[in-house]
Regions:
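Short glycine-enriched loops at secondary-structure junctions
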Residues: 10-14, 189-194, 240
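Conserved non-cysteine loop/helix-boundary elements of the Radical SAM core domain that shape
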Residues: 27-41, 49, 62-217
């Protein structure tokens, strides 16, 4: 069934501290001081334009919702609850910090119809959390996830590879520990240096070196493979290119690309083709038109990389996610297992 989010942006609203990487107004492209009475109008407007079919959720994005005062939380939630009770929306989703979740808050969220909570976890390495000035430890994340799951509230986890003090190994360890928590979905945002943040000062003082684009693509390709192999959905990879964040000077440094996930997907194919070309001079790939852009790479990057050694044929009879290489059929699972084998072996040898 088609799913629709009705977004309410509460950038910076409720956030109790300012982490080294965060300038939320720049990241969301929205600066707001929204009031509860405005929420009803926004919902009504969206419901007028959205199709009558499909599931609809109200989504409070951008802030630390559960750090808002309890009375104000209830004001926001009660507006949405009216629409839930009328059957017009399915539920409410919101984002918050792990250290702003406790038993009383979770009970309240459940009472008002909250169905999904996204936690800005970022890392499960306590050293990285400290250097990023997150203000909590891994143990608080584990406690928050358990509490939410105990009340049958879906949990999303956001992680940020490439934070201060992190490494390829520590970021993968974070992913493995996230998997153990069994979230309903994840988001992966490689760390960017945004203007007017402490991280910008650290970068300019040579105290922090962000991942290069190639490093971020290689690391994130592995993260995608690990999460997908464990059947954990990844609903976004890379920061969404809002109008504001693409303004000159907003992104100071770091691996930003407007189609970052597509870079990772193309890289996953490239690694697979490289392995096959060890034992043959040329490969002929037959693929669905729905996958050909990833096989070819952004702006034909894979075709340029392999040259005449790679021939791509579009075949409308092939289902999405499968392809034939020199007449042998492969699927997504083959691609992901190859990434894990190749990249992790390289990491072990370095």
């Amino acid at each position: 069934m088609k799913h629709y989010n009705i977004p309410i942006f509460i950038a910076y609203f409720g956030c109790p501290n300012k982490c080294v990487f965060c300038n939320q107004n720049k990241i969301t492209g929205i600066e707001t001081n929204i009031q509860p009475e405005e929420v009803k109008g926004i919902i009504d407007e969206y419901l007028c334009t959205l199709p009558s079919y499909g599931e609809k959720e109200l989504a409070f994005f951008g802030g630390t919702f559960t750090a808002i005062s309890i009375p104000l939380q209830k004001e926001f939630l009660s507006v949405a609850k009216e629409f839930i009770d009328k059957g017009l929306i399915k539920g409410i989703r919101l984002s918050t910090r792990p250290d702003n979740i406790d038993l009383n808050i979770v009970k309240m969220l459940k009472e008002y119809g909250v169905t999904t909570v996204e936690l800005g976890v970022q890392s499960l390495d306590n050293k990285v959390l400290s250097l990023s000035e997150r203000g909590y430890r891994k143990e608080e994340v584990e406690r928050a996830v358990k509490l939410l799951k105990d009340f049958q509230i879906e949990v999303g986890i956001q992680i940020m590879p490439g934070l201060p003090g992190s490494s390829f190994k520590s970021d993968l360890q974070t992913v493995k520990e996230v998997i153990e928590m069994k979230p309903n979905f994840t988001r992966v945002y490689p760390t960017l240096v945004i203007s007017d943040t402490k991280l910008e000062k650290m970068f300019k003082n040579n105290e922090f070196v962000p991942l290069s684009l190639d490093e971020a693509v290689d690391l994130t390709s592995v993260i995608i493979a690990v999460l997908e192999n464990c059947k954990i959905p990844i609903i976004r990879v890379g920061l969404q290119p809002s109008e504001d964040i693409r303004e000159e000077g907003v992104i100071v440094a770091g691996p930003f690309h407007p189609a970052f996930r597509e870079l990772c997907e193309s890289n996953i194919y490239r690694l697979f083709f490289e392995e096959k070309l060890i034992t043959c001079e040329k490969i002929i790939v037959k693929v669905s038109h729905r996958d050909v852009s990833r096989v070819s790479g952004i702006r034909g990057s894979n075709k340029k990389y392999f040259g005449k050694r790679l021939e791509i044929i579009v075949d409308e009879t092939i289902e999405k996610g499968s392809f034939y290489l020199n007449n042998q059929k492969y699927c997504r699972e083959n691609l992901l297992k190859n990434v894990l084998r190749v990249v992790l072996n390289e990491a072990d040898n370095n």
